[in-house]
Regions:
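Acyl-donor binding region in acyl/amide transferases
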Residues: 15, 61-153
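Hydrophobic helices that insert into or interface with lipid environments
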Residues: 150, 162-168
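Short amphipathic alpha-helix that is part of the acyltransferase structural core
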Residues: 1-40
């Protein structure tokens, strides 16, 4: 009788190059596209692979602004941003988020992780079911200065969850 170990299922979580992550984000039609921030040295990409094929991506970056919209206690000194989370099938986003939170986020040495989520496109369940807390709402106005696209309303999620919306 042959038995397959869970360790033999061909699944790997590891750092990947930004070009590989960007190619996947584009191929999977992520609404924000690839990670093209001015300070590329401040970006890290990780991937979930199955039998050597990339099936999910998580990109981490430093905060663009000094503080997080609606949560000024979150800043460049104490937080990193999970800037992209995408998979070739949606059910793998939860898996990638959990792997990122448990294994990748602690390597950045910051107290908090934040993620901005499009309020019109997403229900928030991916973050909520992983234990994240929604801490603020960023209302968009006009155009995104970086992309020229119409700005979008965003929910701001934080890990670890806080008791209040104010500074812990």
């Amino acid at each position: 009788v042959s038995q397959t170990s869970l360790l033999d299922c061909g699944v790997t979580w590891r750092g990947i190059g930004l070009p590989e992550a960007n190619a996947a984000l584009e191929a999977w039609s992520h609404k924000m596209g690839g990670m093209h921030r001015p300070c590329a040295a401040d970006v890290a990409a990780h991937g979930l692979l199955h039998d050597g094929r990339l099936v999910a991506v998580a990109c981490t970056a430093g905060l663009i602004r000094e503080t997080v919209a609606g949560a000024p206690w979150l800043n460049r000194g104490n937080a990193v941003e999970l800037a992209r989370l995408c998979a070739d099938r949606t059910s793998l986003c939860r898996v990638a988020l959990r792997l990122w939170r448990v294994f990748t986020f602690p390597t950045f040495g910051r107290a908090y992780a934040v993620s901005y989520q499009d309020a019109d496109l997403h229900s928030g369940n991916t973050y909520r079911f992983d234990g994240w807390q929604r801490v603020s709402f960023a209302r968009a106005g006009g155009e995104d200065r970086r992309s020229g696209r119409k700005a979008r309303n965003k929910w701001v999620w934080v890990w670890p969850p806080q008791n209040t919306k104010q500074s812990p």
